[in-house]
Amino acid sequence: LPKLGENEVYRCIKAVDLAPVLGSLGGLQWTRAGQTGKYPCDVVIKKALPREIMALIEGLDLGGTLARAVLRRLAPRQDIPPHVDDWMPAEADWRRFQVPLVTHPDVVMRWPDDGVSVHLEPGFLYEVRYDRTHEVVHGADCERIHLQIDQVNATI
């Protein structure tokens, strides 16, 4: 698939079997992350991801090079405020993918300037725009755990 078009902010790419990875979530060592002025959340970065998660990433066949992978956990009802991820190098062909692992229909990803709101369902691979204003509105009483993958020169 080509990268997202100018008028697209997300795309559901394919189904993903989560069974091999869900059991590995319980024993993870989460780290509190968040810079001044940014939202705090719990993360597990690439070097600490269990082999089950790394195998899932490899099995997605994204092509290109894995630049960054992180599990991001939000507490119940914890939102991510509107922001643009502008820290990625402009000269690289970065694409962002999300695999929701634990979520709820009341957790919505929004691109307010584009008028798009969507619940990213677990068990699917999505490509999402990070270079437009986006946010997460978390209206549920459960955690939200997503695998976020930044890939350079992806060919999927």
List where the protein language model places each region.
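Tight coil/turn sites that cap or link beta-strands
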Residues: 76-78, 123, 131
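A short beta-strand-loop-beta hairpin characteristic of the jelly-roll/cupin
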Residues: 100-122
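Short, surface-exposed charged micro-motifs
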Residues: 70, 98, 135
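Non-heme Fe(II)/2-oxoglutarate
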Residues: 1-63
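Conserved short histidine dyad/triad with adjacent acidic residue
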Residues: 70-91
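Short beta-strand His + acidic residue motifs that chelate non-heme Fe in jelly-roll/DSBH
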Residues: 81-83, 107-110, 118, 128-129, ...
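A short hydrophobic beta-strand segment most commonly corresponding to one strand
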Residues: 95-100, 125-127, 141-156
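Short, conserved beta-strand element in jelly-roll/cupin
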Residues: 73, 90-107
